[in-house]
C-alpha cells in the first residue's frame, strides 16, 4: 500500500513538472508575437487598445497552466470510472454516489453562470486602475503643478470601489458555491457510510465495501472540488485565452515579401484617404503629390487639418482607407517592416524615447555594431556637443520616455534617431517646437544635408524657421490639399490680399488637388 501511495505521489510530481514545462514552452513560442502585437495595437485598434494587453493575457495562461488548475482536466474523465466501480460494489451505493456527484457538478455550473459577469467586470475595472495609474505617473509634473492629485485620487477611489464591489460579488459566488459543495460532499460521504453500514447489517455487502466506497467517492469528487476552488482563476484565464486568440488571429504573421532595393528616386502619394485607427471618419481626403530625390516639402495648415494624420500614413504607421504611398513605385505594404524602417526616418510630434542609453536610442537599438553611424547621426542633427556634456556621453541612460532630458534635448536626440543610417525619406512632425535658435540652425542644416545626399525631407511646420531649406509647400485644410507648389508661390498666395467678392472670378470647385515635383 505504501508503494502505491509513493507511486501516486511520484506520478503527480511528474505531471506538475510536465505542466510547468508545457507552460514555459507556450510562453517561449508566443512571447515575441505577443510583444509585437502589443506594440502594434495602438496603430490598429485605436482607443480600444487601452483595454487589451496580450502580454498580460499570455502570462495569465502560463500561470494557470503551471499551477494546479489543469490537473482538474486530467482527473475529471475518471469520475465516471470511480462511480462505476462504486456501482459494482453495490447498485444502491452507486446510485447515491451518482446523484451526489451530479449535485456537486450542478453547483459548479451555478458558479460558472453567475460568476461570468462579475469576472468580466472585475477584469475591466483592474485594467482601468492600471491605465489611470500609468497615466498619472507619466504626467506627474502636470498632476503636481496643477493640483490634480486629489481629483485623480477621487477618480482612482471610484474605480477601486467598483473593482472591489465586483471582486467581492465574484468571491461571494465562488465562496458560496464552494461552501455548499463542501457541505454537500460531507453529507454525501456520511450518507455513503451510513448506507454501507445498513447494507452490511442486512448482509447485502461486506464491511470492506464501506471503506472502498468512501475512498472511491472521495476520488470521484476531488476534481469537482478542485474546479470550484480554482474557478476564479479559470474564469480569468478563459477570458485571457479568448482575448489572446482573437488578437493572434487578427495579427497573423505577414508573409515576408521579396527584399526590394533601396529607394533612390521618388515618393509618390496617390489619392490617399486616411482615418485614425478605430474610427471610420477620415481626416485626410484624396491627397496626391509626388516628390523627387533631393526635394524638401513643408506641410502647413491650421490645427486639425490632418497634417499629423498624413505623415503617419506616409511612414506606414497608419494604414490608409484608400490610396497608396509608394517609394520608387513600390507600395509601402510591399516592403518588409524591418527593411522599410531602414529607409525611413521619423520624428513624431510627441518624441518618445526608450529606456536605454543615448546611443541605443539614436541607433534604434542597433548601435553596438555601428558606432560610426551613431556618431554620424549625432553630428548630422547638431547634437554631438550636447551629448558630450551629458554625465556619460553617449552611454548616459535617459530613463523611460527620456525623462532625464529636457524637451529640447529629447527632440534633438529624436532627430538624430530619424537621421541614423541616412534613410531616403525623412519625415519630421513639428521638429522645432521645443528648439532654441541653435536648435533651429541645427535642424536647418540637417534638412539641407538630407537633400544634398539625395534624400527627401517632409516637415510639418508651424513656425517659419522650419521652412528654411525647404523648396516646396503643401497646404492642408479640412484634410484636403488646398495648394501645392514651390515655397515662394504658395507662401505668396497665402499672404496675397483676397479679391473682393464683386470682382472675384468664378472658379469651379475641385477636390483632390494634386501636384508634381
Regions found by a protein language model. Name each.
Residues 1-12, 71-122, 194-205, 222:
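Transmembrane helices of ABC transporter permease
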Residues 2-12, 100-103, 174, 178-188, ...:
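Hydrophobic alpha-helical segments in the permease module
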Residues 24-25, 32-58, 132-155, 230, ...:
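Short intracellular "coupling" helices and adjacent cytoplasmic loop segments at the cytosolic face
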Residues 43-44, 57-65, 69, 117-118, ...:
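An intracellular "coupling" helix at the cytosolic face of ABC transporter transmembrane type-1 domains
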Residues 148, 172, 220-247:
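Cytosolic ends of transmembrane helices, especially the final helix of ABC transmembrane type-1 domains
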Residues 315:
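Helix-to-loop junction immediately C-terminal to a conserved catalytic motif
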Residues 334, 359-400, 444-445, 449, ...:
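ABC ATPase nucleotide-binding domain helical subdomain, centered on the C-loop/LSGGQ "ABC signature"
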Residues 421, 453:
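Conserved signature/switch motifs of ABC ATPase nucleotide-binding domains
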Amino acid at each position: 500500500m505504501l508503494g502505491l501511495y509513493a507511486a501516486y505521489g511520484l506520478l503527480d510530481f511528474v505531471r506538475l513538472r510536465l505542466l510547468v514545462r508545457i507552460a514555459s514552452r507556450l510562453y517561449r513560442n508566443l512571447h515575441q508575437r505577443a510583444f509585437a502585437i502589443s506594440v502594434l495595437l495602438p496603430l490598429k485598434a485605436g482607443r480600444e487598445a487601452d483595454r487589451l494587453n496580450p502580454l498580460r493575457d499570455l502570462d495569465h495562461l502560463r500561470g494557470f497552466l503551471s499551477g494546479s488548475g489543469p490537473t482538474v482536466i486530467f482527473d475529471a474523465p475518471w469520475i465516471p470510472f470511480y462511480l462505476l466501480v462504486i456501482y459494482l460494489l453495490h447498485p444502491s451505493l452507486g446510485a447515491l454516489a451518482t446523484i451526489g456527484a451530479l449535485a456537486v457538478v450542478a453547483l459548479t455550473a451555478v458558479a460558472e453562470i453567475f460568476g461570468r459577469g462579475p469576472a468580466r467586470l472585475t477584469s475591466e475595472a483592474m485594467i482601468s486602475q492600471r491605465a489611470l495609474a500609468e497615466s498619472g505617473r507619466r504626467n506627474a509634473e502636470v498632476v503636481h503643478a496643477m493640483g490634480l492629485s486629489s481629483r485623480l485620487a477621487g477618480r482612482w477611489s471610484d474605480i477601486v470601489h467598483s473593482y472591489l464591489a465586483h471582486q467581492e460579488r465574484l468571491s461571494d459566488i465562488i465562496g458560496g458555491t464552494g461552501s455548499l459543495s463542501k457541505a454537500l460532499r460531507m453529507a454525501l460521504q456520511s450518507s455513503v457510510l451510513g448506507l454501507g453500514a445498513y447494507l452490511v447489517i442486512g448482509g447485502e455487502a461486506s464491511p470492506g465495501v464501506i471503506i472502498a466506497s468512501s475512498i472511491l467517492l472521495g476520488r470521484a469528487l476531488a476534481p469537482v472540488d478542485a474546479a470550484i476552488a480554482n474557478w476564479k482563476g479559470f474564469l480569468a484565464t478563459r477570458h485571457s485565452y479568448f482575448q489572446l486568440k482573437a488578437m493572434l488571429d487578427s495579427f497573423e504573421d505577414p508573409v515576408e515579401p521579396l527584399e526590394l532595393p533601396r529607394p533612390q528616386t521618388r515618393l509618390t502619394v496617390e489619392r490617399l484617404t486616411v482615418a485614425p485607427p478605430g474610427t471610420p471618419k477620415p481626416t485626410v481626403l484624396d491627397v496626391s503629390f509626388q516628390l523627387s530625390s533631393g526635394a524638401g516639402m513643408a506641410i502647413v495648415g491650421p490645427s486639425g487639418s490632418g497634417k499629423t494624420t498624413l505623415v503617419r500614413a506616409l511612414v506606414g504607421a497608419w494604414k490608409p482607407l484608400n490610396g497608396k504611398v509608394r517609394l520608387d513605385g513600390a507600395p509601402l505594404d510591399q516592403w518588409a517592416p524591418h527593411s522599410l524602417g531602414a529607409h525611413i526616418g521619423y520624428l513624431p510630434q510627441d518624441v518618445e524615447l526608450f529606456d536605454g542609453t543615448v546611443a541605443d536610442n539614436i541607433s534604434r537599438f542597433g548601435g553596438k555594431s555601428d558606432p560610426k553611424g551613431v556618431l554620424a547621426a549625432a553630428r548630422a542633427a547638431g547634437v554631438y556637443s550636447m551629448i558630450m556634456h551629458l554625465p556619460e556621453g553617449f552611454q548616459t541612460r535617459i530613463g523611460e520616455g527620456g525623462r532625464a532630458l529636457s524637451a529640447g534635448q529629447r527632440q534633438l536626440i529624436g532627430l538624430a534617431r530619424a537621421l541614423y543610417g541616412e534613410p531616403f525619406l525623412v519625415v519630421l512632425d513639428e521638429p522645432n517646437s521645443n528648439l532654441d535658435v541653435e536648435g533651429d540652425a541645427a535642424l536647418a542644416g540637417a534638412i539641407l544635408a538630407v537633400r544634398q545626399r539625395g534624400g527627401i525631407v517632409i516637415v510639418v511646420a508651424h513656425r517659419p524657421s522650419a521652412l528654411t531649406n525647404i523648396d516646396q509647400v503643401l497646404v492642408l485644410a479640412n484634410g484636403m490639399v488646398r495648394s501645392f507648389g514651390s515655397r515662394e508661390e504658395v507662401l505668396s498666395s497665402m499672404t496675397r490680399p483676397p479679391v473682393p467678392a464683386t470682382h472675384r472670378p468664378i472658379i469651379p470647385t475641385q477636390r483632390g488637388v494634386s501636384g508634381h515635383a
